[in-house]
Regions:
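Conserved pre-catalytic core of RNA-dependent polymerases
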Residues: 2-144
Length: 144
């Protein structure tokens, strides 16, 4: 798995997708799935998930465990599962967190593996949707 320059390669991919979507608003993207399991996209997704920290999911595997296994091997395994159509998300770990009024609300914690795949999917589809959003719309948008 080649991870050199992943941030720049991902930025170029996103820019290309954005410009294509912006140029032709009626354009439909039918082949984004293969972008999700690109080496650079998965590595960038890993870096973003790692930066967010967070607890392990139902599998009990945390960031440190993945680093001990070997990041390259872990991401290569995810890539193979995605490419072969074998990837299945795990159930989320349910924990109750306190609210200001003293009651509790449920929180679902996905596995780190699922968070990596979710982030990779976000990296691939975000520029396509970003091209259609209005400039006056700010909610949950990067750098807005």
């Amino acid at each position: 798995m080649q991870t050199n320059n992943s941030k720049e390669k991902v930025r170029q991919l996103q820019n290309k997708l954005y410009l294509t979507a912006k140029k032709c608003a009626s354009r439909r993207f039918h082949a984004l799935y293969d972008k999700v399991y690109r080496d650079d996209v998965l590595f960038e997704a890993w870096k973003r998930v790692k930066a967010n920290k967070g607890s392990s999911g139902v599998d009990g595997i945390g960031i440190e465990d993945i680093e001990a296994i070997g990041i390259e091997k872990y991401l290569t395994d995810i890539k193979a599962e995605l490419a072969d159509g074998r990837y299945k998300p795990s159930p989320v770990k349910r924990v109750m967190i306190p609210k200001p009024d003293g009651s509790k609300r449920p929180l679902g914690i996905p596995t780190v593996k699922d968070r990596i795949v979710q982030m990779a999917a976000k990296i691939a589809i975000e520029p396509v949707f970003e091209a259609d959003f209005r400039d006056c719309s700010y909610g949950f948008r990067p750098k807005r």
